[in-house]
């Protein structure tokens, strides 16, 4: 899996950073999942390597405008293109009425179905939000001025590496049988021989995991959600020097994000959702924010618009 940042600014866009949105590309799939959709997200998608027609699920963290104002426009554009077969939208309970109202008021009729999933009960009861044979999604309540939710996407373990040489030495002809063996299935060859796929595969490979947490002040639930994750994307609206403001507005400082990564044993942290007050022309720069976080959690990286990062 990999992610592409489509917006990394907090509150309002700047000349170099749009407001919040992130695209997740799934492994061995053309499917894309979108996390938050601030104003201008569809323009950002056009400038990226993401195809809007591949978006199948949208996860919204909370109802502040810098995370949702791009949704009606994106959905309307997808409707005009006729490429979408339907989209699942996960988020707070108010999200359905916001989207339906915006579409109805602008006389927009979509050519595809929307399926809404309210996430609050899943977060409160620690229930799996979505699951198939390859992946599952969990969510958790964060700590912000309005209800906000973090999301975790976890791949299930993958089959071990297939030993082609062993198969060849046993004169098993290449073809669909190799795929069945790699999946650990038992197969019967035309000559009557029977093989168990487990004999040809190494130990299962651990699936990748990605966590997205914004908006929130430091939260123990974010730590729990991020436990042993490969990649945590966490908001860092404020510098540590503005910690008081962070508590007032219930946003995170760089240190809070780094502490979340450290306590959760996350492998890699990327900080995002930066306040526009921090620019290269001001006394505190985005580079300074990165250095603050790295003092607590060395494997920290700084998000920027259109940055693509592998989960592992």
Swiss-Prot record:
Assembly notes: Homodimer.
Purpose of the protein: Zinc phosphodiesterase, which displays some tRNA 3'-processing endonuclease activity. Probably involved in tRNA maturation, by removing a 3'-trailer from precursor tRNA.
Enzyme class: hydrolase
Protein known as: Ribonuclease Z
Gene3D superfamilies per the UniProt record, alphabetical: Ribonuclease Z/Hydroxyacylglutathione hydrolase-like (3.60.15.10)
Family: Belongs to the RNase Z family.
Keywords associated with the record: Endonuclease, Hydrolase, Metal-binding, Nuclease, tRNA processing, Zinc
SUPFAM superfamilies: Metallo-hydrolase/oxidoreductase
InterPro entries per record: Metallo-B-lactamas (IPR001279), RibonucZ/Hydroxyglut_hydro (IPR036866), RNase_Z/BN (IPR013471)
Reactions catalysed according to its record: Endonucleolytic cleavage of RNA, removing extra 3' nucleotides from tRNA precursor, generating 3' termini of tRNAs. A 3'-hydroxy group is left at the tRNA terminus and a 5'-phosphoryl group is left at the trailer molecule
Cofactor(s) it depends on: Zn(2+)
GO-annotated molecular function: 3'-tRNA processing endoribonuclease activity; zinc ion binding
Co-factor note (free text): Binds 2 Zn(2+) ions.
Chain positions recorded as Zn(2+) 2 binding sites: 66-67, 215, 273
NCBIfam families: PRK00055.1-3, RNase_Z
Pfam families tied to this protein: Lactamase_B (PF00753)
Top-level taxonomic group: Bacteria
Catalytic activity, EC: 3.1.26.11
Catalytic residues (positions): 66 (proton acceptor)
Residues annotated for Zn(2+) 1 binding in this entry: 62, 64, 144, 215
């Amino acid at each position: 899996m990999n992610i592409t940042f489509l917006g990394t600014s907090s509150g309002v866009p700047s000349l170099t950073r749009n407001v919040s949105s992130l695209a997740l590309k799934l492994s061995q799939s053309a499917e894309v999942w979108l996390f938050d959709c601030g104003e201008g997200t569809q323009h950002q998608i056009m400038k990226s390597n993401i195809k809007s027609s591949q978006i199948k699920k949208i996860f919204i963290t909370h109802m502040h405008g810098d995370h949702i104002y791009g949704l009606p426009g994106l959905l309307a554009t997808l409707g005009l293109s006729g490429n979408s077969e339907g989209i699942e939208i996960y988020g707070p309970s108010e999200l359905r009425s916001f989207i339906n109202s915006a579409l109805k008021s602008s006389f927009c009729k979509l050519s595809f179905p929307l399926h809404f999933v309210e996430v609050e009960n899943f977060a409160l009861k620690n229930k799996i939000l979505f699951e198939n044979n390859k992946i599952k999604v969990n969510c958790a309540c964060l700590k912000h001025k309005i209800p906000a939710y973090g999301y975790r996407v976890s791949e299930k373990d993958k089959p071990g590496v297939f030993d082609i040489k062993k198969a060849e030495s046993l004169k098993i002809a290449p073809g669909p049988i190799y795929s069945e063996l790699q999946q650990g299935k038992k197969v019967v060859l035309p000559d009557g021989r029977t093989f168990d796929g487990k004999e040809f595969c190494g130990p299962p490979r651990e699936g990748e995991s990605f966590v997205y947490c914004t908006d929130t002040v430091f939260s123990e639930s974010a730590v729990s959600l991020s436990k042993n994750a490969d990649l945590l994307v966490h908001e860092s609206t404020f510098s540590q020097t503005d910690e008081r403001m962070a508590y007032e507005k219930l946003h995170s400082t760089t240190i809070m994000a780094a502490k979340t990564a450290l306590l959760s044993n996350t492998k890699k942290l990327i900080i995002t959702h930066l306040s526009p007050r921090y620019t290269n022309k001001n006394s505190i720069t985005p580079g300074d924010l990165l250095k603050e976080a790295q003092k607590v959690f060395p494997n920290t990286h700084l998000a920027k618009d259109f940055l693509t990062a592998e989960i592992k």
